[in-house]
């Protein structure tokens, strides 16, 4: 099937099979389609709504064409969201990565610059001084030594360049917002995945189950956030041992007070970084303490997904201790220093 046939199908509200989606994605990601065709396909898929079969096929092609990062362990965890929630909250999942590492987890973080928001994970880390242009081997060394490694999506998904223009020009969430978090080049099988709609929670868990994931929490908060929220109940679809169960959680379940998100919005990466440094440090401001509470909730979920903690509650307790110890703040600075060495190596 070529993209013209696919466009005719989706305009008629007809779904593609997994194999048909794979064929179209290979055409897109090998530069065989025009920008107009790619843009039309992305908008058509959004208007039709992507099926599990379609998403599975698309992720398989992204993984197939990615530059892999190889590890000796399968206990790696990723924390990321689809974006597109329109909330412009600070980079919660990226901040949570340092708390997870401080508590003994290993984070293979996969991310990009902002598409529809104010600050993507790459924007934040770059603002902090983290060198992003790492080889796969350097990412692996970073995870082994620091506990956190960042895989800049464009460096590992070179074929994505063929969709970058249409995505940027559309400025809306598209199929790729859904695909990106599931196309981690390290092949992580433990994950906290935030999604922009409750309706996506179970389908994404089913997709990841078909793709071989072991323990995943797919989350969407009642206030619209693609993270575990401090301000509202969060719906969770948990994949564990091949079974999916759904439930709702709220901050009080973990001894944390529900609070509004006012003060957690940021205008850019520098604003996000300042709030995160306060949250991971001495929490001098009310917003810093509030951000810390939200980071702890999300880091706790990642520790549970990574099987470092045996329950979600234990994960949150471990995250709280790691943040309050100051080790999480040190992990951020350690990553900056560690990647600076790679920058010097790569410039020789």
UniProtKB/Swiss-Prot annotation:
It comes from the Bacteria. Keywords: Amino-acid biosynthesis, Aromatic amino acid biosynthesis, Glycosyltransferase, Magnesium, Metal-binding, Transferase, Tryptophan biosynthesis. Anthranilate 1 binds at residues 81, 112. Transmembrane segments: none annotated. The keyword Magnesium applies. Anthranilate 2 binds at residue 167. Its EC number is 2.4.2.18. Pathway: Amino-acid biosynthesis; L-tryptophan biosynthesis; L-tryptophan from chorismate: step 2/5. Mg(2+) 1 binds at residues 93, 227. GO terms for biological process: L-tryptophan biosynthetic process. One of its GO terms (cellular component) is cytosol. 5-phospho-alpha-D-ribose 1-diphosphate binds at residues 81, 84-85, 91-94, 109-117, 121. Binds 2 magnesium ions per monomer. Its cofactor is Mg(2+). Mg(2+) 2 binds at residues 226-227. It catalyses: N-(5-phospho-beta-D-ribosyl)anthranilate + diphosphate = 5-phospho-alpha-D-ribose 1-diphosphate + anthranilate. NCBIfam families: trpD (TIGR01245). Catalyzes the transfer of the phosphoribosyl group of 5-phosphorylribose-1-pyrophosphate (PRPP) to anthranilate to yield N-(5'-phosphoribosyl)-anthranilate (PRA). Homodimer. This is Anthranilate phosphoribosyltransferase. It comes from Stutzerimonas stutzeri (strain A1501) (Pseudomonas stutzeri). The lineage of its organism: Bacteria, Pseudomonadati, Pseudomonadota, Gammaproteobacteria, Pseudomonadales. The gene is trpD.
